[in-house]
Structure formats: structure tokens, C-alpha cells
Amino acid sequence: MSGTGVLLLTLLLLVTMATSDDACSLLNGDDCGPGELCCTPSGDHQGTCETSCW
């Protein structure tokens, strides 16, 4: 069961990364470039790379 969950999570992350260049995930740590922050909506681990979060 846990192997299936890991596989699904990996596929989800790959799809997210492929569809948006500025996407980041707090599950992976900070995927953003130098000087960028991973800005996420409250309660979500997926977000976008921004120079500042509002």
C-alpha cells in the first residue's frame, strides 16, 4: 500500500513540474532558484516560486 502511495505522489510531482516551470512543493523542500521563495496557499504544500510572498 505504501509503495502505491509513493508512486502516485511521484507521478503527481512529475506532472506538476512538467505543467508549470515555476511550481514548487514544500514536500521536496525549496525547489526554487536563488532569491526565490516557495509561496503556497494556506493549507497547501504545492505553490509557485516568487521573489516575495504576500
UniProtKB/Swiss-Prot annotation:
Tissue: Expressed by the venom duct.
Cystine pairs: C24-C39, C32-C49, C38-C53
Signal sequence annotation: 1-19
A GO CC annotation given for this chain: extracellular region
Location of the protein in the cell: Secreted
One annotated GO molecular function: toxin activity
Keywords recorded for this protein, A-Z: Disulfide bond, Knottin, Neurotoxin, Secreted, Signal, Toxin
Statement: the UniProt record of this protein carries the keyword Glycosyltransferase: no
Domain of life: Eukaryota
Function: Probable neurotoxin.
Domains (record comment): The cysteine framework is VI/VII (C-C-CC-C-C).
Protein known as: Conotoxin Cal6.17
UniProt source species: Californiconus californicus
